[in-house]
A protein has these predicted regions:
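Glycine-rich beta-strand-to-loop/alpha-helix junction loops that act as flexible
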Residues: 236-237, 347-350, 469
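Adenosyl-5′-phosphate
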Residues: 1-4, 339-346, 365-366, 370-581
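Hydrophobic (often cysteine-bearing) scaffold residues that line and stabilize catalytic clefts
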Residues: 17, 96-99, 118, 205-212, ...
Length: 581
């Protein structure tokens, strides 16, 4: 994972402005500790902090077109770059082996109308000195973070993390996923549009577990491209287990040579983190033994987690409760991963949003509401799980890739008939009894990959990551923050925090730390803020009258469902849900 900084509409190139850009870039050097680069020309400055994954010898940035008239700083991975390079064979003189250089070739031919050609994760700033124009863009879901800032003098700032912009520009905001900004026609323009965003376009579609399997396997294989050692995050839940199993099935051959040669690092390493005795750890070990990875189990103590909290909030740049809770163990894990020489990991983010995997989806009143909620969840993912996974890992110079959010796979999964994803329908088995597997969340994914996993994992009920690493972690956070924040402080919370006023003491505590790092109004507004139960959107609170006065993002907040899962009694869980329906 790299880091970028750019300043556009520069009226005069001065040593002071170059020094300023270097200082901004230095604040995000943790994202790219391998090399630093900067280019100043015309009305632009582009700086880059590199984490070398593909073409480590010659892929330094910024990147230049053959005539030097276009310059590019990009944080990302373009998974279909080889196919694009083949299209331009003999027509474009590539200067490096970097996967991201295809952006320049596409821009030279198509102008700004090329973003749909890319399958990857990216955030980039491109300066065209010939036209004195710039283009900024972000990937379809917002896997890669990006912020844009403005000054009254007309300067436009871009950075991978808000810490580079804090105090350097008058206002800034998250750059919207699936959008671009072209200086010749200013303003955010949406480039990523899909028919599946509307329920009417998918309600009569078919559903195929075979299609899910084939498409996800292809996505994982694409995303394994790497010239450095890589691994997988294996929590022991369904999503990470599926990604790990698929990755292991391809790990012996080098993807970059179309599997014609052996992999440079043929043994796949898997990583799990949690408190001792955490639910995730035993299941992760079971999966690792089953698929044959070299497994590493990282234990942390509650005190170690608490000690890291302030640093974690600085790196992840949020005070959202769910994100902070889950980021601490991931941040601690990333440090160990980096110490072992691993620079890239694949993980399972996105599956719960696509397939309705959170426990509250059991309450979806219809297929239409179910589908609309998945679309809402995906539209907000850049503010939650994508942010957590990216920034927790990049704090230690580790890149995270998320095959469930692959652009091609997303189309297959989101065009699947929503009725096949729902977990509230209970078809009878041949014996006439209710089939417990029929009502569990993400059933179509489980059916697609059950032959690759131990049965007790393939059909294990959902645990949120922060719950699964150890329940006492969440309980301690609630207790500590409740004791640290007084009732009087909460009574006057709106006076201290008029923007996104904290809804509970835990949020107040995190917000106070966040404000120490990032005191601006722009920073406060950059964080999402809405009532939630078990990671729901605010809209989904209408599904259950009891949820309207609750605000607990833990999966345990969904009454009756999670307690049964803890007992390991899937049949009882299904029957309880059936009784309540």
């Amino acid at each position: 994972m790299c880091g970028i900084v750019a300043i556009f509409n520069v009226k005069e190139q001065t040593p002071e402005l170059r020094t300023k850009a270097l200082g901004m870039s230095k604040k995000i050097r943790h994202r790219g500790p391998d090399w630093s680069g900067i280019h100043c020309s015309g009305s632009a400055i582009l700086a880059h902090e590199r984490l070398s994954i593909v073409d480590p010898e010659s892929g330094g940035q910024p990147l230049f077109s053959p005539d030097g008239k276009q310059v590019l700083a990009v944080n990302g991975e373009i998974y279909n770059h080889k196919k694009i390079r083949e299209r331009y064979k003999g027509r474009y003189d590539f200067q490096t082996g970097s996967d991201c250089e295809v952006i320049l070739a596409l821009y030279r031919e198509k102008g700004v109308n090329f973003l749909e050609d890319l399958n990857g994760i990216f955030a980039f700033a491109l300066y065209d000195e010939e036209q004195d124009a710039f283009l900024i863009a972000r990937d379809h879901i917002g896997v890669i973070p990006l912020y844009i800032g403005y000054n009254a003098d007309g300067k436009v700032f871009v950075a991978s993390e808000l810490k580079a912009l804090e105090g350097e520009c008058e206002r800034y905001e998250p750059f919207l996923p699936g959008h671009y900004y072209w200086s010749k026609d200013p303003g955010m323009k949406r480039w990523y549009k899909r028919d599946w965003m509307e329920y009417d376009n998918v309600k009569d579609n078919t559903a195929s577990s075979d299609a899910i399997r084939m498409s996800l396997c292809a996505a994982v294989k694409r995303q394994m491209m790497s010239d450095v050692p890589y691994g997988v995050l294996l929590s022991g839940g369904l999503d990470s287990s599926v990604i790990s199993a698929i990755t292991e099935s391809y790990a012996e051959r080098r993807i970059e040579t179309d599997s014609r040669s052996r992999a440079w690092w043929p043994r796949l390493h898997s990583f799990a983190v949690g408190l001792k005795g955490a639910p995730d750890l035993a299941k992760a070990r079971l999966v690792a033994d089953h698929i044959g990875t070299v497994h590493h189990e990282i234990n942390y103590t509650i005190q170690e987690g608490l000690d890291a909290l302030r640093d974690v909030i600085y790196f992840i740049e949020t005070y959202d409760i769910t994100t902070v809770r889950a980021s601490v163990p991931m941040y601690l894990l990333a440090r160990v991963i980096k110490s072992m020489g691993i620079k890239m990991v694949l993980s399972g983010e996105g599956a719960d949003e696509i397939f309705g995997g959170y426990l509250y989806f059991h309450k979806a009143p219809s297929a239409e509401e179910f589908h609309k909620e998945t679309v809402r969840k995906l539209s907000k993912l850049h503010l939650y799980d994508c942010l957590r996974a990216n920034k927790s890992l990049s704090a230690w110079g580790v890149e995270g890739r998320v095959p469930f959010l692959d652009k091609e796979f997303l189309d297959v999964a989101m065009r699947t008939n929503p009725k096949a994803k729902m977990c509230s329908v209970l078809p009878a088995s041949r014996s006439g009894e209710a089939d417990p597997k029929a009502s569990i969340e993400k059933r179509i994914v489980r059916e697609a990959f059950e032959d690759m996993l131990p049965e007790e994992v393939a059909w294990r009920q959902k645990e949120q990551f922060s719950d699964g690493v150890g329940y006492s972690w969440i309980d301690t956070l609630k207790k500590i923050t409740s004791e640290a924040v007084t009732d009087e402080q909460m009574a006057h919370a709106e006076e201290r925090f008029p923007i996104n006023t904290p809804l509970c003491k835990e949020e107040y505590y995190y917000r106070s730390i966040f404000e120490e790092h990032f005191p601006s109004e722009s920073a406060a507004r950059s964080v999402p803020h809405e009532a939630s139960v078990a990671c729901s959107t605010a809209v989904a609170l209408e599904w259950d009258e009891a949820w309207k006065n609750m605000n607990d993002p833990s999966g345990r907040a969904v009454s009756g469902v999670h307690e049964n899962a803890l007992q390991g009694d899937a049949v009882k869980s299904v029957n309880d849900i059936k009784d309540k329906a």
